[in-house]
Every structure is written in structure tokens, then in C-alpha cells.
Amino acid sequence: MNLEITNHFIKAISVILPKNPLRKEDELKLCNINERKYQLLQENSGIFNHFVSDESTYSSDLATQALEEFLSKDILKKDEIDLLVFTSFTPDYLAPACTSLIHKNLNLSSHTLCLDVLGFCPGFLQSLLQVFLALNQPSIKKAVLICASVKSKAIDAQKDKITFLNNSDSASAILIEKNTNIEDKSYFAQKIFSTQCIEETLPYNGLQTNSNKNIQANTALAFSFTMQNYPAFFQDFLEHFNLKKTSFNEFFIHSSDNFSKQKLYEKLNLNFTQDNILKNYGNTTINKLPLELASYAGGGINKFYLEALEQGLPLMHVA
């Protein structure tokens, strides 16, 4: 599906990373891995730091802190929030909704429209689309999109040590304001490949008795799928909207490690540089793209390209 819609303004981004409750020595012992193997993992992944929440910190806690940054710094007033969207694959509960917890924690206005979305790696882009569509409504002028992950709580550190040591828990709050110039456009595209969805990501949590308590993905399947399908999707997106690669100030393409990103950039004929976001902050999953935008050195990007891969399920772009 390809969509051309009104482009709205990303005005501010707040990113929260928890402080690791464990020392490196404790983590290596937990994962049953020695120092030399850990160094090899760092060299291969390009990840030299990661952030894990403590036992009492959950998605709603990090999300509350991210939004509170806007309020405490007078970037936004409570009664200005017309729409609050929360996206995560690690919510505190199925009920009550995390937006209700955030709303209660910060005593937000009763007029704020709240929406909870189940979202994995492309969750930021999927929810960004929903926010952009909502901002076309006359009564919605300012929206906050919150993405949060405490994936560390759903990883078996003994059996999936690489994922645990690369993962970072995080939350982001993105303030998005209405653009009244309807001639200013943004472009979204998504393509779904569901044939191998259960093989790529094993059923996780939920009410079915055959689901797993821990998140586990087939990374080899995800990598081969991406290399096979993404380049054509990338090219189709540009051609459909008559866009040129040279017209973009920056490309932000989600990847969980430097090796995969380098191979993909080679396929796309894009200039690859080592990913400092991965190096300094680890794999922040749903918050990789918000962190990229918040950390962009130039600031004030006029035209950029965002992309996320759902490890073999949706492929998604926004420009």
C-alpha cells in the first residue's frame, strides 16, 4: 500500500534510557560468556553499550518520563495534548491500557484522546502514520507519539545471550503538530509478507497455551528475507512517488547490528558509515528511528527517509 498524505511537523523528541542495574561483570556471568567472546560480539555487532531497566521499571514508567520532559521544560502544556498514542510490544499489562497509566501518572487533561498500539520494530512508523492521519481532523492540533520497550524482561539471557547483550530498553516521546499547508506531502508505503511470520518470530505471550514467555526470533531467516525482498521494495517506493535518492538530506534505515546494515546499504548503493547510535546506545528496537532523528547532528532536516523492517513481516517507508 502506497499513501500520499499531508506532511505534519515533528517539533520535539525526548528519549529516555534506563541506567543498567548490573555491572558488566555481572552481565557476563548472567549470560555465561567470557570477556573475549564479549569483545568479539561487540566487534561483529558494532554495539559497545546497552541499557537495561531494573526489576521495578516498566514501559509506562519510561514513557511517563519521556513525556514529562516536554512538560517540565515548557515545550508543551497538558491541555494542549489533543492526541496521545502509545506504541509498544512490551506493555505493562493488557489492561489497563498504558495510555491510561501515563495519563494518570501525569494528571493529563480529560479531553486528550488516547490510543494504544501493539507495535514491533516498524511500530514507530506505523503509529506515525496514524498520528498524521489524525492531525487532518480539525479538532486535533498537537499530538504526542510515545514508543517504549522493556524487551530485556522478555529475553532469556542464558539461551539468547547475543540479543540480551545487544538490546537496550528505552522510551521516546515525539511531539507532532498540525501543518495547515495541505500541499506539503509525506509518503508512506508498507508491504506485508506473512507466510513465514510464525517461523520468523516464535509466538510470544498472549492467551494461547503454545506461546512463549520470551521473545525469540530467527535472525538468519530475517536477514535472508531482507536481502532478498527489500531492495526491490526500496526502488518501487522511489519510482511510485517519483523520488530520487539524491533529493534526500539523510537516510535513516533501522538495523539491529552494523553487519546487517552494511550489507543492506551495499545492496541499495548507499554510502555506509559505522552506526554510532548502535555503538553508543545498543539496539533500541522501536526507538531506533526516533533516536536517529533526535541525535542528527545537523538538525532541522528538510527532507529525510525513514525505514523499518519487521524481521520478515512488514516492510515500511516514510519520506
What kind of region is each of these model predictions?
Residues 47-65, 115-122, 163-165, 213-232, ...:
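Active-site pocket-shaping loop/turn-to-helix segments
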Residues 1-55, 159-224, 232, 300:
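Condensing-enzyme catalytic core mediating Claisen C-C bond formation in acyl metabolism
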Residues 60, 64, 90-91, 109-111, ...:
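Claisen-condensing/thiolase-fold acyl-transfer catalytic domains that form or cleave C-C bonds
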Residues 14, 87, 118, 143-149, ...:
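Short beta-strand segments
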Residues 138-170:
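Flexible, glycine-rich active-site loops centered on histidine and acidic residues
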Residues 27-29, 98-109, 132-137, 159-166, ...:
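A glycine- and small-aliphatic-rich helix-loop capping segment at beta-alpha/alpha-beta transitions
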Residues 212-278:
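A contiguous, well-structured pocket-lining segment that forms one wall/lid of small-molecule binding clefts
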Residues 10, 55-121, 238-261:
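Conserved beta-ketoacyl condensing-enzyme motif
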